[in-house]
Amino acid sequence: MDRNRQLLLVIGVLFHFFYLWSIFDIYFVSPLVHGMDHHKSTWTPPAKRLFLIVGDGLRADKTFQKLTHPRTGEEKYLAPYLRSLALNNGTWGISNTRMPTESRPGHVAMIAGFYEDVSAVTKGWKENPVDFDSFFNQSKHTYSFGSPDILPMFAFGDGVVPGRIDVCMYGHEFEDFTASSIELDAYVFHHLDELMHNSTTNATLNEELRQDGNVFFLHLLGPDTAGHAYRPYSAEYYENIEYIDRKLEEVIPQINKFFGDDQTAFVFTADHGMSDFGSHGDGHPDNTRTPLIAWGAGVKKPIHLQDVSNLEEQLLKQSPENSGFESTYFDTWELDHLVRNDVNQADIASLMAYLIGANYPANSVGELPLGYIDADPVTKARALYANSLAIVEQYFVKEQEVYNHQFKFKPYSPFEEKSIQKYQQEIESLIDQLEKSGSGSKDEIEKKVIAKIEELMKTTLDGLTYLQTYNWLLLRSIVTLGFFGWIVYSFNIFLKLFVLNEDELKIPPEFSVTLVGIFGALAISINYLLFYQNSPFNYYMYAAFPLYFWYTILNEKKYLITGIESFLHGISNTTKFLIVVSFIGMYEGIAYGFFERVMFSIILIIIGLYPLLVHGAHKVSGLMKTIWFITCLLMCTFTNLDPVKIESLFQINVGTILALIVSIMGTKQVFKRTQVGPIQKQLIIAQIAIIPIILFATNISVLSLQARTGLPLYSQILGWITFIVSLIVLPILHFLNPSSDYQLRLLIIFLTFVPTFIILTISFELLFYVGFSLILLQWLSIEELLKFSHKDLVETFEKTGKLPKGYWLQVIRITIIGFFFLQLAFFGTGNIASISSFSLDSVYRLIPIFDPFSMGALLMIKLIIPYVLLSTCLGIMNHQLEIKKFTISTLIISTSDFLSLNFFFLVRTEGSWLDIGVSISNYCLAILSSLFMLILELISSVVLSGVEYNSDGTKLDFEPISYRVRKRKVT
């Protein structure tokens, strides 16, 4: 491999991996600090113990609203007991979670009061215990029951007091999506009952259970499992909620009877919700709205709206429109007559700490929700003040950390205007007044002190954000220079690899002492600055790339200028302008398409017209132009369909029939025009024969799973056999008996992936696969007709020693269209705006037991298949244009980061969690597109190894005209 190509690959991979992570280092750095003193929530705890009950994946609306049961048709409340607690015994509201709406971040927020950065979902669960303080760690002892994915992460770790947290959990084999999810929750209730029963015969255990400050954590995974498997509107999901409600109605009185002192507090909530699609992770309201009900010792009883003094203000506060809900969201809840107390999920940790008098978790940023507390004004004020001091403690530690590593530190201006000490003096003075005041003025003073404490908390949290983003300007400038540097640097390598001739490259760049001195001084200065700021290793890499890129660019500017002249040789200024407009238009259109998929439809229509507009359009027949335009119109259908798909056996069967028809017709055409050996014929017939077999297995699996009878073993085995044979065994046999015809090779690749798509599709994905294959095949044919003929290339080369004028224009066009198809391969069936657009329904046909890595691998295979088709197409394009391997992909790589740069500046840290999540996902997908191009044509070089092109009888590893031009002597 050429040294420049090796350099491009190595540096390209490193650059994109490091810069992929840059948004997390800049925008989403965890505010985690260590070394704070603890602050006790209250010296007069109202409860001796607390039960935290978490319904994993439980939506707020399904918990409270009246619903029609899908199995019985009865209109009912699914959780009448929990509703009765909200109506008669405690306080209720909506707990608003943050993105990512996954189990680990959700539990960390409610138990530690801390929002992990977005990268938390990459840390796993059991294998990565939380590395910060938690409410459990501040309890006397915690007894936890439930899932092996959740319990261990709080029970182990450097900061956990050994032996403080007990875990009782089932094995992973219990998490079977085709079995009853109720069994998971039954396990929890059974073992809680067993624990209390054992204490009657074990005096030591009995004494331990009755200690003040104990916590009992019941993690109920059933709703999440049922929601994933059957959707949150299914009978299974509803029945799981009903089961939890019935068991709580039994268990709560038993708990009160067991302890016999009415000193138990209860909190019922969820870690996240569940989308209608049966997934979670993004910021959709169905995922972020969870129920919260608290009752028992220390919790305020329900307050009727008619009893509040500021009725108008309260009505305005909890009206759907003013509190961020749809106008009809609460319509059937029949809780409108009660005060609703909504909280942020991290506030739950502060509430629980107060109820049993524990220290606030050291890293908690939650605010004690006073609406849930039944206490006198002074107690509430002191508890909230202690809460604020715990947050102030974090600010002091973080400020010192930043101050120690800055040449010149600029303090947070609001605390310059009014110091924390001043806030403390005012608050303590107001609390003293509150203690001494009479009943007449107490309410007014209480409002003042609470407002002052909340002001301190908000200012402190804003101050923490200020400290977190202290070096934003420097880092964003470095990363921006890095992106622009990479774009120019990689384009320069493209020119050296594919455009400049060898004699031009033999003249080395002149050594410039000035240039070395300038960049040497810059490197020393930036590295010293980063060292002084105690920056992590990643920061040094962010700075190293732009320094290297821009030094190389300026040092090799002669290559860049000469190469651009050769690349644009013979292209008019008007055409150059149109090229720039096309590049900008395509990349900006794609960027907009990340938010509105309809833009991909508009671009497809424009691409459908391009054979009419380009030079040489007369070479393409009217019939081919018409078929091409119709195909582009049909492909628009997929980018307008809802990416959140519902399983449809009808669409699966229709897609399979279409794939079978295309397979048979394609086979007949290839057999007619190509001499195919007997072994290859048998293998292709076997590939086609597998299609109805795997369709049969898929139908059996889908019908059984939809009927809730589980996954039949024989259909699972048949599915795996056909999956492995079609994807692994038959391709290997083809490899052992290779064909040199490129159309036959394309047919084999198409047939290889049809069975995989059948068993892993839930809706229209197979139809998209067939359409995408056909549009790529037509694109190949059109570009073959539009290219310079081999004869013209040879004649021009022999006369001038150069390529024809405008030769690279077709490469530019293919690059623009190819990058669009790279995005279409994903957006044709998916939408990055919703993590929930990836369904697990299909993988249940092969893996019914919860196994995130295996399930994720199957989904990745399904996502990668269209890219393999595209890589094969680009590989053949290189040959058709008689250019070297990797020419097209290298040009795409050098320009595609304009899209990444777009999304780097569109990353959001404020607004809805859906918007924040989308901005992160967009950036990651854009930068991975560039990285993925490095892999695509490597794949094509493997799958097209030894293929011959019939028009000139040469192989794909022939020496193309463009390469002979590069080797000519400079005259």
Curated annotation (Swiss-Prot):
Domain of life according to the entry: Eukaryota
A Pfam match: Phosphodiest
Membrane topology: Multi-pass membrane protein
Stretches assigned to the Cytoplasmic side: 1-8, 499-510, 555-574, 619, 667-682, 738-745, 835-856, 907-923
Main localisation: endoplasmic reticulum
Lumenal compartment segments: 30-477, 532-533, 596-597, 641-645, 704-716, 769-813, 878-885, 945-971
GO cellular component, one term: endoplasmic reticulum membrane
Alphabetized GO MF terms: mannose-ethanolamine phosphotransferase activity
Enzyme class: transferase
Functional note: Ethanolamine phosphate transferase involved in glycosylphosphatidylinositol-anchor biosynthesis. Transfers ethanolamine phosphate to the first alpha-1,4-linked mannose of the glycosylphosphatidylinositol precursor of GPI-anchor.
Protein name: GPI ethanolamine phosphate transferase 1
Organism, scientific name: Candida albicans (strain SC5314 / ATCC MYA-2876)
